[in-house]
Amino acid sequence: MVTMRDLLECGVHFGHQTRRWNPKMKKFIFGERKGIYIIDLQKTIRYFRYTYNIVRDAAAEGKSVLFVGTKKQAIDAIKEYAEKCGMPYVNHRWLGGMMTNFGTIRQSIRKLEVIETMEEDGSINLLTKKEALMLRRKKEKLIATLGGIRNMKSLPDMIFVVDTVKEKIAVQEANRLKIPVVAPIDTNCDPDVVDYPIPGNDDAIRSVQLFCQEMAEAINEGKSLLEQDGGEQAAGEEVSQDEKDAVVAEAMSEEDFGEDEE
């Protein structure tokens, strides 16, 4: 479990400039130095350990935790530690409705499965070169946006978010669906939208890595208490020819499909 030394070495105590703050964070601020707010690490470690236990206990009950973080400093850590604890993640772009319109998201994941099946059974080679190219482009885009949640068959029981300001849509969806939110909260954040806040720096790479690492450790500790591996997955649904045809037609209709989105 995290120590005070860990927090100091990773710069968890450094907040934002004093002109960029949320007054609701006042109770978590120790002071100010050179125009930067300093977060009270005594409170951080208390909230950190409490939240660690909450996440561990959730995992021990077989609950799922969705990792969310799409900014540059979080992309790698979110993927790395979500995979280390076998949890779903979003680290590319949060699609509006990813949770509130989950049925549609599952349909898109199904399209990814159809394309991969076509590659495996060779049926993609029966298409024209252009059709095959468009399908592969569609596959790459689906993997980028949905690859981390492709095995998430239902809504998560909890979400862990890095930067609740940037990921406000994800947080809003979780709040609407009564899905508990776990998150580090920097001095510019609103703690009221987070069920299990941990006051701390959500910008520095080492700080972000520490938060992700601790959440993964809590989950793995909880999973070990389940006394079951949980790694067995149900067999995928068989892909029909109609599904293949529909995905090809959709890919061919997306003329601007290869363009990057910001």
UniProtKB/Swiss-Prot annotation:
This is Small ribosomal subunit protein uS2. Residues 223-262 are annotated as: Disordered. The gene is rpsB. One of its GO terms (cellular component) is cytosolic small ribosomal subunit. Residues 227-238 have a biased composition (Low complexity). Pfam families: Ribosomal_S2 (PF00318). InterPro entries: Ribosomal_uS2, Ribosomal_uS2_bac/mit/plastid, Ribosomal_uS2_CS, Ribosomal_uS2_flav_dom_sf. Residues 252-262 have a biased composition (Acidic residues). One of its GO terms (biological process) is translation. The keyword Ribonucleoprotein applies. The keyword Ribosomal protein applies. It comes from the Bacteria. One of its GO terms (molecular function) is structural constituent of ribosome. Disulfide bonds: none annotated.
